[in-house]
Amino acid sequence: MVKLKGLRQINPYVAGQQPNERDMIKLNTNENAYGPSPKVAEALQNFDDQELRKYSSLDQTELCQALAANLGVSPDQLIIGNGSDDILSMAFLAFFNSGESVLFPDLTYGFYKVWADLYHVPFREIPLTDDFEVHPSDYFGDNGGIILANPNAPTGIYLPLEQLEEILASNQDVVVVVDEAYIHFGGQSALPLLETYPNLFITRTFSKDAALAGLRVGYGLGHPDLIAVMKAVKDSINPYSVDLLAESLALAAVQDWDYYLETGRAIQETRDWFAGELAALDFQVLTSQTNFVLAQPSGISAAELFQQLEERRIYVRYFPKAERIKDFLRISIGRREEMETVLAAIEEICSS
């Protein structure tokens, strides 16, 4: 590496691979196999390309209004970003500046640790229980803020709302960020708690429920004072982070939310069926409220099963460097026919 003063040494986030092969089954990055609403395709077809000569809007007013109506909040409780990763990254800059350690689980979304390191935010990883669950009392006491994915990733386990409220009630002097990337697939949202807890900030994405991972749109919800701080950070980095096309297509998705409710139910039904089939093969399957399952194979190592599935062009996620789940595979939930193919492949591999 070239030797120059001031270069930063960073341990970056490691994303799932993005293979591009014909006849593959891609179940490694929790994408929505059902695709966007037909209304999104219609909006794309009707988009005026002359609009692209302009800068995007600063506040995505129309999208905020549609989301607010859909979610039962006011527009001043919303901020739109370039994916929920953008919102979460800005949250670290906006909320975690006390000098005290920010708390998050030892087994969760890997970006939290990366952002803490990148922005020089002290942090402490709180071990999940032996059952991979969050224990609320572990988050009591002095800290500089808390961030929890609920349902958690990569475990898929949901923290009941009453337990989340215990954490909020015990930490009213700091911001508690709840990452709801997967809330569409099970569990109860923390949205009803916004009115009671001004220290609550919720993040959501269009990547999972709305099948728009390639578009990059996400949003945050919180007290207007928190949103004001977030917008100040956004305007200090890139006020035009949400492009016009993304805003237009995300709006079309919100306006056809019944479509996503239907596909969400289909994913949940397929997930529960698939988890049951894996359990019948003596796999240890964690109870998931997401669009994936985390499972420990029986009679074969996770590494071997991962390799043999890949040889069949079936891509799942393996975490060899995560000690607590190095014997597990995370498998996204596709359409029923895809999952039947995956199950048949697993049965064949395990019986050979």
Curated annotation (Swiss-Prot):
Record-given protein name: Histidinol-phosphate aminotransferase
SUPFAM superfamilies: PLP-dependent transferases
Domain of life of the organism encoding this protein: Bacteria
Gene3D superfamilies listed in its UniProt record: Aspartate Aminotransferase, domain 1, Type I PLP-dependent aspartate aminotransferase-like (Major domain)
Disulfide linkage: none
Species classification: Bacteria, Bacillati, Bacillota, Bacilli, Lactobacillales
InterPro entries named in the record: Aminotransferase_I/II_large, HisP_aminotrans, HistidinolP_aminotransfase, PyrdxlP-dep_Trfase, PyrdxlP-dep_Trfase_major, PyrdxlP-dep_Trfase_small
Record-listed E.C. numbers: 2.6.1.9
NCBIfam families attached to this UniProt entry: hisC
UniProt xrefs under PANTHER family: HISTIDINOL-PHOSPHATE AMINOTRANSFERASE, HISTIDINOL-PHOSPHATE AMINOTRANSFERASE 2
Keyword Transferase: yes
Catalytic activity: L-histidinol phosphate + 2-oxoglutarate = 3-(imidazol-4-yl)-2-oxopropyl phosphate + L-glutamate
Cofactor annotation: pyridoxal 5'-phosphate
Pathway: Amino-acid biosynthesis; L-histidine biosynthesis; L-histidine from 5-phospho-alpha-D-ribose 1-diphosphate: step 7/9
Modified residues (N6-(pyridoxal phosphate)lysine): 208
Assembly, per entry: Homodimer.
Pfam families: Aminotran_1_2
Any one GO BP annotation for this protein: L-histidine biosynthetic process
